[in-house]
Amino acid sequence: MSRRHAAEKKVVPADPIYGSVTLERFINKVMMHGKKSIARKIVYSALERFAKKVGAENALEAFEEALENAKPLLEVRSRRVGGATYQVPVEVAAGRRDCLAMQWIIKFARAKPGKSMEVGLATELVDCFNKQGATIKKREDTHRMAEANKAFAHYKW
């Protein structure tokens, strides 16, 4: 165990337009090379496109619902017992749940071929809202992996 004190959680201020801390964290994850204004433009225009596509009057609520649909509940962690390594299913902590969902959405939005980031992000959010697409598939694969290794659940630490 580390002898140092636990790292303090950095407080992220709410974003200026919607007043949401979650959205500001999402913007920070989209940001590359410290260019926050570009990340903000991308996220806000993607949110507008997304809200139009799903027919939501409140883009923030729709975004939070899409994020909720992408959050994993279980994941597997490697645990070495004797000479064998087991994939042990564990519940995902609330903060990590948010973080994983955001990372997956951004990863698959960037992977969309021939589209700008804002179009890809809007499309991926629509897919998450409708419970389909690459992000939801990743979540289901994670859950399936945890379900398949349920026999090793007693190795929790």
From Swiss-Prot:
GO terms for molecular function: rRNA binding; structural constituent of ribosome; tRNA binding. PROSITE patterns: RIBOSOMAL_S7. Gene3D superfamilies: Ribosomal protein S7 domain. One of its GO terms (cellular component) is small ribosomal subunit. The keyword Membrane does not apply. It holds the Pfam family Ribosomal_S7. It comes from the Bacteria. GO terms for biological process: translation. The lineage of its organism: Bacteria, Pseudomonadati, Chlamydiota, Chlamydiia, Chlamydiales. This is Small ribosomal subunit protein uS7. One of the primary rRNA binding proteins, it binds directly to 16S rRNA where it nucleates assembly of the head domain of the 30S subunit. Is located at the subunit interface close to the decoding center, probably blocks exit of the E-site tRNA. Belongs to the universal ribosomal protein uS7 family. Coiled coil: none annotated. The gene is rpsG. Part of the 30S ribosomal subunit. Contacts proteins S9 and S11. Keywords: Ribonucleoprotein, Ribosomal protein, RNA-binding, rRNA-binding, tRNA-binding.
